[in-house]
Amino acid sequence: MTLQFEAFCAGGLAPGWSLTVQGHADAGEEKFEINFLTDAGDIAFHVKPRFSSATVVGNAFQGGRWGQEEVSSIFPLTLGEPFEMEVSADAEHFHIYAQEQKVLQFPHRHRPLATITRVRVLSEHRLAQVELAKRSLSWGDGGY
């Protein structure tokens, strides 16, 4: 797979960060993954759509070993069609959406989140756009 995108998360990951990837899933090109990395070399979160099995897999690589995979059979992606995937983080989970449909919720296995400092997207697909954004989270009525 080819490194298509890499970004440094200033101050580390925090609730409110999101990554959106848009591209085209060409037939015969089934490989695509997103990795959230720590400075220590761990993969705090790895998400990979598997077109051959129509599943989305989440996992973490810590201390030199992979953890237990979490697999979702909710798979709205189609080879030969454009796609959009979004990964967002709150205080407890990563949330993965494909084609605006929630496909997986993955609990944070790596703490603190601030030690997650890089994001990599590897793909054989043509990526049209990758956006890493930090949105502020608010709660309540805003004083109105």
Curated annotation (Swiss-Prot):
Residue ranges of every copy of the Galectin domain listed in the record: 5-133
Which Gene3D superfamilies would you find in this protein's record?
Answer: 2.60.120.200
Q: What broad taxonomic lineage does this protein's source fall under? A: Eukaryota, Metazoa, Chordata, Craniata, Vertebrata
Q: Which InterPro entries match?
A: ConA-like_dom_sf, Galectin-like, Galectin_CRD
Q: Which Pfam families match?
A: Gal-bind_lectin
The protein here is known as: Grifin
Question: Cross-referenced PANTHER family, in alphabetical order?
Answer: GALECTIN (PTHR11346), GRIFIN (PTHR11346:SF21)
The alphabetical list of record keywords is:
Lectin, Phosphoprotein
Q: Which PROSITE patterns match?
A: GALECTIN
Q: Where does the record place a coiled coil?
A: none
Q: Name one GO molecular function term.
A: carbohydrate binding
Supply the gene name: Grifin
What's said on domains?
The galectin domain is atypical and does not bind beta-galactoside sugars.
